[in-house]
From Swiss-Prot:
The gene is sec-10. GO terms for biological process: exocytosis; Golgi to plasma membrane transport; protein transport; vesicle tethering involved in exocytosis. One of its GO terms (cellular component) is exocyst. This is Exocyst complex component 5. InterPro entries: Sec10-like, Sec10_HB, Sec10_N.
Length: 659
């Protein structure tokens, strides 16, 4: 029962909502109908408005056509009237000049009408120049006089209006028709140039000139009717005036004081600075002529650049010569003539006769002098890049390279090596040979590395792929190879002298030294070996200071091998008893210890085998066979082992000796 009541209530609610829905739908349909009707009416009104706009546009076009036509008609009527009026005014004012009376028209007497008066006078002047001179000479003179007065007044007005660009522009426009316009421009440009004052090393004035052009270009464009002409005039005055005066004075001062270094340096600096300034001026579009700025630059520098190459080479020759002369004077050394086959022959003969001069161990190589010469040539290469044209540059660089090779290679390094070679005796010396040639090699090598660095930059980038590249490279390589060849020859001779002196020291050993009768003697390194060891240690120390890397290893290996061969031969000159063999072991051990410090493995193996061979002389007779077959003697010739065993005084008593 209750369920049916609820269903009934819901049915009533449903009916109520349905009635509301029906009412709202009816209302919506009515409003939709009204909206459509309004939209239709608005569409019709819009169409009418468009039609009216088209009619109005057509009417405006028709009216504008009539107005333009009417304007043309009025203009065609007005122009003749205007010209007639102007002609009438000119005739009236011309009459004033024809009469002998003073000019009374307000246009001539009112200072405020100067511009109108100037325009009128210019026209009258132009007309008067077309008249017959005999008939109108007086009026021409009078108009010309007035023309000059007005022209002067315009220039004065222009100068007086410096702070009023608008007024200056008005005056300049009128004045541009007068003959004195160029004079006005000149005065204005001169006025601007007065703000430039020489200062510093010359570079500051270039910066001032550039800044002046940058700041004045907008002002000139606003004032003058032809600003490009005025800017060209300004730049022309700058170049031919203050700039040229300052640069010329600066370079003349260097010439007057004979300061060639500062002359070349300032020339390169000022020229390169001027080129940089010209690049900045090109951004301002000063002139339509692309050669305008370069022509002005040439007008200042051409006479200096024309002689630059010869002056650069003269300066380099003088400077390098003076550097070397001062160095040799500081060493109190008078250079000897070197070079050529005759000199080498004399040098070798003197060396063989032991008539050598060591100059107290002086190397005659100065790294500071070499650096100074390299710096001078480096500066010269930089100046050449700035001052030489592309066609002339490679040849000039080759000439600078020739100067560098002449003095640094020929007059300094080659001379030092030749002098060092002359100080090495080719005979077996009885006095301790000096070790300074290693220092010569060390210093020369350092300078060569600096030279190679300069060749890589800046020389090679300049000459690369030019006509002089092959010849410069050939000269450079020949010079360095010649120097390296002489240094190698000197090192070879130095090793010979070292081994020769060691031979001399050991030559004082006697046969009895290794066959002492007494067993009660000190077992120690022989005095001769001690002297040789100290001597070799000093030589190798100098060698290590003078050489490094593979060169040092090769030298030490060669020296160790030569000493090994000498000792091998020297040992076989004597016979040994057991005590003498122990003494010999001390000598060989001393030299082996010295060689072991050189870190040359191949040579050390030789000395270990030599010590093993020497040990054959010291062991007991019944141990000789065993010692002869030790691992240290595996690679030693069996005959050599046999020869060593025969050096024992008790060789014949050894039983069952087999190799």
């Amino acid at each position: 029962m209750r369920f049916e009541e609820e269903i009934g209530s819901l049915q009533m609610l449903c009916d109520q909502f349905q009635n509301k829905i029906n009412t709202l739908e009816k209302q919506m349909n009515e409003e939709k109908k009204d909206y459509v009707q309004k939209l239709h009416r608005l569409h019709e009104k819009n169409g009418e408005a468009i039609d009216k706009m088209k009619q109005l546009d057509h009417t405006m076009q028709a009216v504008s056509t009539k107005v333009v036509h009417l304007g043309d008609q009025l203009e065609s009527v007005d122009q003749p009237r205007s010209r007639a009026h102007d002609a009438h005014q000119l005739m009236q004012h011309f009459d004033e000049f024809l009469s002998d009376q003073p000019l009374n028209s307000m246009i001539f007497t009112d200072p405020d009408k100067l511009l109108e008066s100037a325009d009128l006078v210019h026209k009258l002047y132009s007309i008067s120049q077309e008249l017959n001179k005999d008939k109108f000479a007086n009026v021409q003179a009078r108009i010309g006089q007035r023309y000059k007065v007005v022209e002067d007044l315009l220039i004065e007005e222009f100068v007086r209006s410096q702070r009023d660009e608008k007024k200056m522009a008005e005056v300049a426009k009128i004045l541009s028709e007068f003959k004195g316009y160029s004079g006005c421009v000149d005065r204005y440009v001169d006025f601007l140039c007065q703000s430039i004052h020489p200062r510093g090393d010359g570079g500051e004035i270039l910066a001032d000139c550039l800044q002046l052009c940058r700041t004045q270009q907008p002002r000139i464009s606003a004032i003058f009717p032809s600003p490009h002409t005025v800017m060209q005039k300004l730049v022309l005055n700058i170049f031919t005036g203050r700039m040229k005066e300052t640069i010329t004075a600066r370079l003349r001062e260097c010439k007057d004081t004979d300061d060639q270094e500062h002359y070349l340096r300032d020339l390169a600096y000022l020229y390169s600075s001027t080129l940089k300034m010209c690049k900045e001026l090109e951004k301002l579009h000063i002139s339509p002529d692309s050669a305008f700025l370069s022509t002005l630059t040439d007008s200042i520098f051409q006479r200096y650049i024309a002689t630059y190459c010869s002056e650069e080479l003269k300066y380099l020759n003088d400077q390098c010569s003076n550097l070397l002369q001062r160095f040799y004077e500081s060493k109190k050394h008078v250079k000897k003539q070197i070079g050529g086959g005759l000199h080498e022959l004399k040098r070798d003969v003197a060396a063989r006769l032991m008539n050598v001069e060591t100059y107290g161990g002086e190397t005659f190589v100065a790294e500071d002098v070499a650096i100074s010469i390299l710096q001078e040539t480096k500066n010269a290469f930089g100046r050449a890049n700035q001052l030489c044209d592309k066609e002339e540059l490679p040849r000039h660089v080759e000439n600078i390279v020739d100067v560098l090779l002449k003095y640094l290679y020929g007059e300094h390094l080659d001379y030092a090596v030749e002098t060092g070679l002359a100080g090495i005796s080719l005979a077996e010396s009885k006095t301790e040979p000096p070790a300074y040639f290693f220092s010569v090699v060390a210093k020369c090598t350092s300078v060569i590395l600096l030279m190679i660095k300069q060749f890589e930059d800046p020389i090679f980038p300049i000459i690369k792929e030019t006509i002089v590249e092959p010849s410069v490279a050939k000269k450079w390589q020949q010079s360095l190879r010649s120097l390296e060849s002489k240094m190698s020859l000197g090192l070879e001779r130095q090793l010979n002298s070292i081994v020769g002196y060691v031979k001399f020291l050991f030559s004082e050993q006697k046969k009895t030294d290794f066959r002492p009768d007494s067993q009660q003697i000190d077992i120690r390194v022989s005095p001769q070996c001690q002297l040789a060891s100290r001597f070799l240690a000093n030589q190798v120390a100098a060698m290590e200071l003078g050489c490094d890397g593979e060169n040092l290893e090769a030298l030490q290996s060669d020296l160790a091998t030569r000493l090994f061969k000498f000792m091998l031969t020297h040992i076989q000159q004597f016979t040994y008893n057991s005590t003498g063999a122990v003494l010999l072991l001390c000598d060989v051990g001393e030299l082996r210890t010295l060689v072991s410090k050189w870190r040359v493995q191949n040579a050390l193996t030789q000395w270990e085998s030599l010590q093993a061979l020497t040990n054959l002389l010291a062991v007991l007779p019944d141990q000789v066979n065993e010692t002869a077959h030790s691992s240290l003697l595996e690679n030693v010739d069996r005959q050599l082992i046999h020869d060593f065993v025969r050096l024992r005084t008790d060789f014949r008593s050894i039983k069952n000796f087999q190799i």
